[in-house]
């Protein structure tokens, strides 16, 4: 109610199914929570979907029209709870499929490059991720 009255766009960010209390890792749950809220959107994290074994294209389609910003990752494996980030286009996630679906939806929000690896010097890999987004 507060967001609607004050023109504030709020977004729910999902996390993987780390514990039984967290069911908002599932995009269907988030969609159900926000469907009637005018100013409440989703901030989906495709890396957490991957860790939970949820296909990101399915997630984006489920949340269509209610996505404010995207936390975008590529990961070494799909469905591995202890997954590792890799530069975009070099991992197991369907990066082109995700981008194509977001384009199809007319998504005009922000892509947040979320690279959680190479903690001592992540910049070269983050630049690769940025270049991948520019090309695709």
Language-model segments: residues:
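Histidine-acidic metal/acid-base catalytic patches
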Residues: 23-27, 31-44, 50-136
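Anion (oxyanion) recognition and catalysis
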Residues: 4
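Aromatic-lined carbohydrate-recognition surfaces of secreted/lumenal glycan-active proteins
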Residues: 8-21, 43-44, 51
């Amino acid at each position: 109610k507060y967001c609607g009255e004050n023109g504030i766009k709020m977004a729910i960010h999902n996390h993987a199914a780390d514990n039984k209390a967290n069911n908002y890792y599932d995009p269907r749950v988030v969609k159900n929570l926000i469907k009637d809220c005018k100013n409440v959107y989703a901030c989906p994290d495709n890396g957490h979907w991957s860790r939970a074994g949820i296909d990101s294209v399915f997630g984006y389609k489920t949340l269509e029209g209610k996505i404010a910003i995207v936390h975008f990752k590529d990961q070494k494996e799909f469905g591995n709870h202890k997954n590792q980030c890799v530069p975009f286009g070099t991992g197991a996630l369907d990066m082109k499929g995700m981008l194509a679906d977001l384009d199809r939806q007319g998504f005009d929000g922000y892509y947040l490059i979320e690279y959680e690896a190479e903690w001592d010097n992540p910049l070269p890999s983050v630049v690769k991720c940025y270049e991948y987004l520019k090309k695709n």
